[in-house]
Regions:
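Extracytoplasmic/lumenal domain signature
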Residues: 1-41, 45-321
Length: 321
């Protein structure tokens, strides 16, 4: 089964075990009125036959898939929505001064807790242990002060790492910073550390859009102004930086002891790889020009190849011949 969203209002489930891909189910967000628009941006997450996905309408859905096989051995689904959680509240709307509270990232799940973020800067934790009974109470709530497109990153200890944009330039953005570590076990004072990513020339060219990559005691974050940062996860100290070009929206990827990141967005796009033999001091091992356009999507690596979509509308595979 393939699960994906679209800009035509629909989140789809498509079967790949037929002679050709076959749509089995779709949910139209226009039938679930929310607060912004009806796109689906994040990747669905599935835990024990339940799919969790937030939409740009600002609503998080928990959907029981009821997966099974028909008499011919083909997969089938009979989904039912268990819970819908609105990602906004009156306090958030008053604080940000607008109604942009869409969910544009994927969720993070650990030990029965689900975390999601939205464009109003809200970081929300839900207890999903009773979701099949229609319950998903809010157990954590933090306002970061600005738009969050990056997915929350969670470590083995339950700490959250959040990358935040810089668009509204509210006072809260100065208080909180743009790359932060949160401890949900301290709901009244969860901010552990923060790193500021200030604007360069305009009020909106600071912050971070890309989801950080969590390594061995180091968080790697690509920023909108064009810096790649290596941050100590314990202290928040910036250990190392490198220039990767403005508009760095593609999320870095760690694979086989290397960090892979899209670079040079305004110069035709490209990829760069760093050795993480010393996690605190990445060493560039190769740099490849793409030339086809800016890469904003996150690459996938499989069988020695890099697969990624580009802003020029093409899907690419890079690797040795």
């Amino acid at each position: 089964l393939l699960y994906f969203g679209s800009r035509d209002n629909k989140l789809r489930i498509v079967a790949l075990d037929r002679s050709e891909p076959t749509e089995l189910w779709a949910i139209d967000s226009a039938n679930h009125p929310g607060i912004w628009n009806n796109d689906w941006d994040g990747n669905p997450s599935i835990v024990e036959d339940i799919m969790f996905e937030g939409g740009e309408n600002g609503i998080l859905f928990a959907t029981k898939l009821n997966r099974s096989y028909d008499g011919e051995g083909r997969v089938q689904v009979t989904p039912e929505i268990l819970v819908k959680v609105e990602g906004w509240n009156d306090d958030l709307i008053r604080s940000v001064g607008d109604r942009n509270a869409s969910i544009e990232s994927s969720v993070a799940i650990l030990d029965g807790l689900l975390y999601f973020t939205n464009s109003g800067g809200r970081v929300v934790g839900l207890d999903i242990t009773r979701v099949e009974s229609g319950e998903a109470p809010v157990v954590f709530d933090f306002w970061a002060g600005d738009d969050i497109d990056a997915s929350p990153v969670i470590d083995a200890d339950g700490m959250l790492y959040i990358a935040i944009e810089l668009e509204r330039n509210l006072p809260r953005a100065d208080e909180v910073g743009q790359i932060i570590k949160l401890d949900p076990s301290r709901p009244d004072d969860p901010l552990v550390w923060s790193v500021a990513v200030p604007a360069l020339n305009s009020l909106t060219d600071g912050g971070a859009w890309a989801t950080p990559a969590l390594g061995d005691g180091v968080l790697y974050a690509a920023t909108h102004p064009g810096d790649l940062l290596a941050i100590d996860t314990d202290t928040g100290e910036v250990l190392w930086t490198d220039a990767i070009g403005f508009h760095a929206w593609s999320s870095p990827l760690i694979v086989d002891g290397h960090l892979l990141v899209a670079v040079d967005c305004e110069a035709g796009g490209g990829f760069r790889a760093y050795s993480l033999a010393d996690p605190a001091n990445p060493v560039q091992v190769w740099n490849m020009a793409h030339g086809g356009g800016c890469i904003e999507s996150t690459p996938t690596v499989w069988d020695g190849r890099i697969f990624v979509g580009s802003r020029d509308g093409f899907f690419y595979a890079f690797g040795d011949q």
